Amino acid sequence: MIDNKLKLVIKVVLLIFLLHSLMSIFNLETYIKILAKYQNQIMIIAIIILSGLIIVDIASEVFKKYARTREEKAGEYLTLNYIFKYLVYVCVTLMIFGVIYQNVSSLVVSVGLIGAAVTYALQKPILNFAGWIIILYTRTIKIGDRIFIKNMGAGDVFDIDTQHIYLSELTTDTFEPTGRVLIIPNSYIFTASIENLTKGSPYIWDNIVVHFTLNSNINKAEKIVFESADEVIGNLMRELYEKWSKRKYLISRKLSDKPVVRVGITRSSFYIKALYLVNVYEKAKIRSEINKRILEKVNKENDVKLAYPHIKAVIETENKFKNT
């Protein structure tokens, strides 16, 4: 505690010394006269900046209030907040340039030169900014969406700014939280394939594959897998079928009111695959419950066995008799 106070005192003394040295070297009266000459412009710029900050602060509170009261559209309100905030910043910047450069031709030339230099030096940030504009305009991604980016990972979007998309990282197989944050440049919208798992509807097709030994009763195995999936997710699929079958733009053959079962064969087993609709946010929970029911049902059957990797050794013995 004493060391911190001592450091603070030293910094204050050093600051006073530096300011005194600066005043002795430069003629401050000259600079004060220059500032006084432009005092009106300085006051106008200060008022513009303060007004812009106040407007942004008030608007942010309004948008956040609506986001809290209408959770289903929270992402849209937060995105509108970003758009409004940066529009205010752009307007404030243009107004400041207008105050400084009263000559329009000088303003245009200055902005052109500055823009060319900035574009060359900040290519990636500008590309990220362009990606941000595309995201806001096309609404392909919004806060609250669950997305997957190839070779990057999956996660829930919790923030989007002018440069990056921020994700709460999830595992790519069961979408379990990892506790990490993925920061994705907005330019990926131009170069990478991004899967939005919740756009339009949070329901996706998931599947469970269960391998059985070749001598298991295939009919019982198929029944076990189907019934386990139907008991867990069947009611939801029937509700969605009733709801979606009334929509004209959906093709009826793509809908199903119950889990779909497929059978396949491998070199050492056969497998039953169950396909079903599930809320993407409950994928891990539903898969776990179906697996649990399958195990419970298999354990009750004598002629149904789960296959697993193993090696079976067959030893043949041969009796040899020698003539004595």
Curated annotation (Swiss-Prot):
InterPro entries: LSM_dom_sf, MS_channel_1st, MS_channel_C, MscS_beta-dom_sf, MscS_channel_2nd, MscS_channel_TM-2. Pfam families: MS_channel_1st, MS_channel_2nd, MS_channel_3rd. It is found in: Cell membrane. GO terms for biological process: transmembrane transport. Its main location: membrane. The chain crosses the membrane at residues 8-28, 42-62, 80-100, 116-136. Keywords: Cell membrane, Membrane, Transmembrane, Transmembrane helix. Belongs to the MscS (TC 1.A.23) family. This is Uncharacterized MscS family protein MJ0700.
